[in-house]
Amino acid sequence: GLYMNQHHLGKNDARGFEDSERLLINRALDAAVFETSPLHILNEGLAYDRCQVGVVTNMPETTPILMDQHDIQGPDQMRTVIRTQVDLVLPEGAAVLNAQDDAVVGLAELSDGEVLYYAQDANNPHLSAHRQQGGRAVYCQEGFVTLARGDQETQLFHLDMEMISRLLTQGLHINTLLAVVATGWSLGITPLLIRAGLKNFGQKHDQVSKDLARMNG
């Protein structure tokens, strides 16, 4: 669907060019988040020329529609489609990539900006190699979602935290949670604010403001 802040504007598939453009031309918005798919990219392209953050959660397999309409027969052709999102990352931006998918990791070289990996396992080899070079990563360790830059680690929150536990019970996948955290961090949002945002997910703006004011003393 299509959301603006907490307002649900439409229930239909909003991944198309028209809905994306609708958000981009809205002067009341400071940021927008878009989801897309290989078919949408091939049929319409993306509504933006560059982006601050590009997230790739997995390398999809081809489908009969993609094969029939666009001759996407296998992994090599699919890579040329999915790389579009990474190609558009600004030099001052970041590509957020799933380190658990080797094909996604292979897109890192295409980013003009920083690369930030996420994985459930702190010992993921791609993630570990990235950290050895001073890179940033997000992962789970002893039940804590953890931020790392090189060998420096920050425990953000435990998966048992009330709101997180509830969302996971309702079907939120841990990989999605890690991608969300990594995206927020790549945008320069502080760990404190990321934690507060997740803790207060779905609450009204006034209540969130009160909680943040309380945290700031």
Residue ranges and their predicted role:
Residues 1-3, 205:
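Anionic-ligand anchoring segments at beta-strand to alpha-helix junctions in alpha/beta enzyme folds, i.e.
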Residues 3-48:
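Conserved nucleotide-sensing/catalytic segment adjacent to the nucleotide-binding pocket
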Residues 43-216:
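Acidic, Mg2+-coordinating active-site environments of NTP-dependent enzymes
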